[in-house]
Amino acid sequence: WLVPERAGPGPSDGSSLVWLYHSHVHAPKDSNAGLIGAMIITAKGKTRPDGSPTDVDREFVTLFNIYNENQSWYFDINMKTYLRATNRVDTNDLFFIESNMKHTINGYLFANMPLMTMKQGERVRWYLLGMGSETDLHTAHWHGNTVLFHGHRTDVVELLPASMKVADMLADNPGT
C-alpha cells in the first residue's frame, strides 16, 4: 500500500500525523459496528525500522466517540441474544435509545480501558481522534502533565466530530 507524500506531514507538522478512516459504504452502521480507526503517516526518512517516528519514545492513539448501538449492524443480533422478551422492548423509548449510546475512548467504557503508561522523561506522541455527530464534543485532558499542540503548551485539547490532532508530551510528572 503506497502512501503519496502529500498525505504525510507538511513543513509545519511534526514528523508524523494521523488520518481517520471510517467506512462510507453503510455509514453510520459500519462506524457504529467498529469499522473506524487511525492511519499514522510518518515522514520519509524519519522512521525506525518498525515504522515509528525517530523523535518520540512512545505513541498513543485515542479515539473519542459515542457509539450508537441503536444504529449498529449488531443491534438486532444483540436484542435476540441478550433479551428474552424482545417484543416487550420499546426501541423508540428515549431512555432505551440513550442506554445504547456508548461514550468511549478506544471503544472502552466506564474507565475499563487498559492503562496508558509511560516513563518519566519519555517523549510521547498522542494521536487524538474525535468522531460521531453533533453530540460528540470531547476534551482530552491530562492531569499533571502538559502537551505541545500547534506550538502552544496546554493540558486540554478539544475534539470535535471528524477531528484528527497530534500532540507531543515530555512525561515529566510521575504518578499522575
Regions found by a protein language model. Give the residues of each.
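Copper-binding active sites and cupredoxin-like electron-transfer domains
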Residues: 1-176
